[in-house]
Regions:
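Active-site core segments that coordinate phosphate-bearing ligands/cofactors
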Residues: 1-8, 14-20, 33-43, 47-48, ...
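Short glycine-enriched loop/turn motifs at secondary-structure junctions
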Residues: 26-28, 53, 141
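Short beta-strand-loop/turn "lid" adjacent to the catalytic site in phosphate-handling enzymes
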Residues: 10, 14-35, 58-61, 66
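A conserved helix-loop-beta module that forms one wall/lid of the active-site cleft
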Residues: 43, 49-63
Length: 170
């Protein structure tokens, strides 16, 4: 009841630097509150869990939002830079940076988790996609990354952690 605005972590840092409250599309799409077709906060979902949709600021696309730093930030840093939104979600940035010019490329981003996906112009909302564990996240240029989370390096990381506890080093 006391909150007036909800910001994702990258957007919160942007707010601290500029005083502007916006919600960058790719990171906003990961929270489960964004209507994948309309690309804005889904008031039906939010109302069911007791959150007001007006708490979420306007969605901005990566690269479409540029605002100067706050005067005190400029003075402290000596910078005349502006903040420009980028794909804040790491997967969206990784997919954007992948060296492929093919429209039908499949991407695999690996770390603790691995995420496999394709770029699409529209969300895939079929029962079949849901049954197979695919989800739609925001991508660069207002596109959709149709993704599936798959096992990454977590098993290897946990195995190494356990072996280290046992005094073994590999």
């Amino acid at each position: 009841d006391n909150a007036s605005c909800a910001l994702w972590t990258p957007d919160l840092f942007g707010y601290f630097l500029t005083g502007e409250r916006v919600s960058e599309y790719t990171i906003a799409s990961t929270g489960g509150f964004l209507d994948a077709c309309r690309r804005k906060a889904d008031s039906d979902i939010l109302s069911k869990i007791g959150i007001r949709a007006d708490m979420f600021p306007d969605i901005v696309m990566p690269g479409d939002f540029s605002v100067p730093l706050l005067p005190e930030i400029k003075e402290y840093t000596g910078s005349k830079a502006s903040l420009v939104t980028v794909p804040s979600h790491d997967t969206a940035s990784a997919f954007l940076a992948a060296p492929s010019s093919s429209e039908d490329a499949i991407f695999l981003s690996s770390g603790t988790w691995s995420i496999m996906g394709v770029m699409a112009d529209e969300p895939v909302l079929s029962a079949e996609a849901m049954e197979h564990g695919f989800s739609n996240e925001g991508g660069a240029f207002g596109r959709i990354t149709l993704i599936k989370n798959i096992m990454g390096l977590w098993i290897e990381q946990e195995s190494r952690r356990q072996w280290k506890r046992e005094g073994k080093s590999y």
